[in-house]
A protein has these predicted regions:
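Membrane-embedded alpha-helical segments in integral membrane proteins
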Residues: 22-36, 55-57, 82-86
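N-terminal membrane topogenic signal
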Residues: 6-22
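Alpha-helical transmembrane segments that form the membrane-embedded catalytic/substrate-binding core
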Residues: 102-109, 134, 138-184, 201-227
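Alpha-helical transmembrane segments of multi-pass membrane proteins
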Residues: 53-57, 78-82, 139-150
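Short, highly charged, low-complexity non-transmembrane loops/tails of multi-pass membrane proteins
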Residues: 234-253
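Cytoplasmic-side transmembrane-helix entry/capping segments in multi-pass membrane proteins
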Residues: 47, 66-77, 98-103
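Membrane-interface helix-boundary motifs at transmembrane edges
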Residues: 10, 58-70, 121-127
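Membrane-interface helix caps and helix-loop-helix hairpins in membrane proteins
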Residues: 35-40, 62, 87-97
Length: 253
């Protein structure tokens, strides 16, 4: 923590420190707002996001790597957009807000994944194929873990993070006339559950989950293509030797 504070104080690009401070103030405002509205769960989310906003500086302090300006801004946007989706109901007020975040998440986690092999062993820096494959796999793995989390929250706490979709047709072995035969119900116009009429059959989040994972995978593939074409000309991270120890002087390792 002391090293992170020193990194902020010796920031060679002061606008980054001011942007980070503005983000933390926005998170603090959102937390106070949630407490005043009595939504303690939202206030807890804000607290966690406040820690998340500090992650770019934490990574730089712990790894002695300097994050590019573009990635720094993109990470802050992604973290705050995720919080705003819940706190300010943007998931419901702006169409495809959730999908946009999953697309951004696919890019962010693939980017981080492409640098993990280098962090483990510097000799992998030039092995671009390995880094591309690891980036895509890492992003897909994070996407799957997130969907596990959403499933658990829906299953055990009665939430609806895996948003339901009304479908107009069902194809299932459970409907078949014999073992191994798929039965179908087509052109579903209405369903009644315990006396409650619905406009169609609820899929209990399956379509939303698969859509999220495909979008996140697409984001990872997009990053992989850009990474391959860039050929290291615009690195997202730059290894530094003593950036946090020499009052803002950046020394390339």
């Amino acid at each position: 923590m002391r090293k992170m504070k020193q990194c902020v104080r010796t920031e060679a690009r002061p606008w980054r420190a001011w942007l980070w401070l503005a983000c933390e103030i926005f998170v603090l405002y959102s937390m106070v707002r949630s407490l005043r509205m009595g939504t303690l769960s939202d206030a807890l989310v804000c607290l966690l996001v406040g820690i998340g906003v500090a992650l770019p500086y934490l990574l730089e302090a712990c790894l002695d790597w300097r994050m590019s300006n573009t990635l720094f801004v993109f990470c802050l946007f992604y973290i705050l957009a995720s919080m705003s989706g819940r706190i300010y109901k943007l998931y419901y007020r702006i169409e495809h807000w959730d999908k946009m975040l999953h697309l951004c998440g696919g890019v962010v986690f693939a980017l981080l994944g492409s640098y993990i092999p280098v962090l483990l062993n510097e000799k992998y820096r030039s092995d671009r194929l390995l880094r591309i494959l690891f980036a895509i796999a890492f992003s897909i793995a994070i996407s799957a873990l997130w969907e596990f989390y959403e499933f658990g929250m829906d299953r055990w706490f009665g939430l609806d993070m895996q948003r339901d979709t009304l479908v107009s047709a069902i194809h299932s072995y459970e409907l078949g006339s014999a073992t191994g035969v798929i039965g179908s119900i087509d052109s579903i116009e209405s369903v009644v559950v315990n006396g409650v009429p619905l406009d169609g059959y609820i899929d209990i989040g399956l379509i939303d989950t698969m859509g999220d994972m495909m979008i996140e995978t697409f984001g990872a593939v997009v990053y992989a293509v850009v990474f391959a074409l860039d050929k290291g000309r615009h690195p997202a991270f730059t290894r530094v030797g003593a950036v946090c120890r020499e009052a803002g002087k950046t020394v390339l390792a």
